[in-house]
Amino acid sequence: MNIRPLHDRVIVKRSEVESKSAGGIVLTGSAAEQSSRGEVLAVGNGRILENGNLMPLDVKVGDIVIFNEGYGVKKEKIDGEEVLILSESDLMAVVG
């Protein structure tokens, strides 16, 4: 994937979600929830602080993260895959 996020931005590929209910019914459309977890594919250099110093990000490529998909999250298709571009502040946790 040929993309490099800027500053405190992170590129995340959303994890697949089980598309069957507990009873074995296949869920489609709005009944199938989207995952709020994904794999970090790329990270920016860091956030520039008020004093001009660069604060590196806490996440790295390959981390599995839980994110808040709210205002400011951008969906893009890169090389045919849908990815999310979000700020590190939209990440809530690293899994594992």
Curated annotation (Swiss-Prot):
Heptamer of 7 subunits arranged in a ring. Interacts with the chaperonin GroEL. Belongs to the GroES chaperonin family. It is found in: Cytoplasm. Its main location: cytoplasm. InterPro entries: Chaperonin_GroES (IPR020818), Chaperonin_GroES_sf (IPR037124), Chaprnonin_Cpn10_CS (IPR018369), GroES-like_sf (IPR011032). GO terms for cellular component: cytoplasm. This is Co-chaperonin GroES. Keywords: Chaperone, Cytoplasm. GO terms for biological process: chaperone cofactor-dependent protein refolding. GO terms for molecular function: ATP binding; metal ion binding; protein folding chaperone; protein-folding chaperone binding; unfolded protein binding. Together with the chaperonin GroEL, plays an essential role in assisting protein folding. The GroEL-GroES system forms a nano-cage that allows encapsulation of the non-native substrate proteins and provides a physical environment optimized to promote and accelerate protein folding. GroES binds to the apical surface of the GroEL ring, thereby capping the opening of the GroEL channel. The keyword Cytoplasm applies. It comes from Shewanella pealeana (strain ATCC 700345 / ANG-SQ1). The keyword Cytoplasm applies.
